[in-house]
Design a protein with these regions (language model features):
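N-terminal intrinsically disordered/low-complexity leader segments
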Residues: 1-13, 207-217
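Generic hydrophobic, amphipathic alpha-helix propensity
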Residues: 14-22, 39, 64-76, 140
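Helix-turn-helix
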Residues: 17, 21, 25-59, 63
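Amphipathic alpha-helical packing segments from all-alpha helical-bundle domains
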Residues: 70, 74-77, 124-150, 160-165, ...
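Amphipathic C-terminal alpha-helical segment
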Residues: 102-106, 146, 166-185, 199-211
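Amphipathic alpha-helical segments used for helix-helix packing
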Residues: 105-124, 175-179
C-alpha cells in the first residue's frame, strides 16, 4: 500500500470514529447538549482535529443523517421489491411502511437521529445532498396514486394525506418500542402490522373531512 492510500485509509477511519462517537452522544444526550469538544473528548482528539474533518456540528449530523436515510432506502428497496413491477401497489406500500418499523429495530440510533430529536438541523437546508430522500418519497406517493387509480383507496384521495397517515401508523409502533412504552407482554412486531393494516383498512373507506399536510422535506 502506498503512502497516499494509507493516509486516505487513516483519514476515513478517523472520520468514521468521529461520526460513531457523535451518533452515540447525540442519541444519549440530545443533539443540543453535545458540543464539538465533547465529541473530541470521547475519541481523545482535539476540537481542532474534528474541525479539520467537519466544519461544524451540523455537518456531522447531516453526514449521519445521510447515512441513515441511505440505509433506509437500501432496506426499502430490498423489502418492498422495487424491481417487481407486477406486484400490486398496495402490497408494495404495505411492505414499505412496515420497513420503517424494521429499520427502527435494526438501526435504532439512526432512527432516533432522523425522526425523534427535534433539535437537529432540518435536512432541507442541504437541498441537493438529500435529493435522494425526496425521490424516495416521490416514488412512494406515486405507488399510492397507482393504488388510488386501481381502486384500493377511495377515488380522489390525496396521496400525500395517505402517505402521512401511514407514516404516523408506522412511526407510532416505532416510538412505543424505542421509548420502552409497550405494555407487558405486548409484541411490537404484531402491533406494527396491526396498526398499518388498520390504517390501510380505514384508508379504503376514506376521510370524512379534508386535510392538506405541509411537507417536511
Amino acid at each position: 500500500m502506498g503512502v497516499k492510500e494509507r493516509q486516505e485509509r487513516e483519514r476515513q477511519a478517523t472520520a468514521r470514529a468521529i461520526l460513531d462517537a457523535a451518533r452515540d452522544l447525540f442519541v444519549a444526550e440530545g443533539y443540543s447538549n453535545v458540543s464539538i469538544r465533547k465529541i473530541a473528548e470521547k475519541i481523545e482528539y482535539s476540537p481542532a482535529a474534528i474541525y479539520s474533518y467537519f466544519p461544524s456540528k451540523d455537518d456531522i449530523f447531516l453526514a449521519l443523517s445521510e447515512e441513515g436515510f441511505r440505509l433506509l432506502l437500501d432496506s426499502a428497496e430490498h423489502c418492498a421489491g422495487r424491481a417487481d413491477e407486477a406486484r400490486p401497489p398496495i402490497d408494495w406500500i404495505r411492505a414499505a411502511f412496515l420497513n420503517v418499523f424494521t429499520f427502527s429495530k435494526t438501526h435504532p440510533e439512526y432512527y432516533a437521529l432522523m425522526f425523534v430529536d427535534r433539535s437537529v438541523p432540518r435536512i432541507s437546508r442541504d437541498w441537493e445532498r438529500f435529493g435522494f430522500v425526496r425521490e424516495m418519497r416521490r416514488q412512494l406517493t406515486d405507488r399510492i396514486q397507482q393504488a388510488i387509480d386501481r381502486g384500493d383507496f377511495v377515488a380522489g384521495s390525496d396521496p400525500e394525506v395517505i402517505f402521512r397517515v401511514l407514516m404516523v401508523a408506522s412511526q407510532g409502533a416505532c416510538m412505543l418500542r424505542l421509548c420502552d412504552r409497550m405494555a407487558p407482554g405486548e409484541d411490537a412486531d404484531a402491533l406494527a402490522h396491526a396498526t398499518i393494516e388498520a390504517a390501510l383498512t380505514g384508508l379504503r373507506i376514506g376521510f370524512s373531512h379534508s386535510y392538506r399536510p405541509d411537507s417536511c422535506l
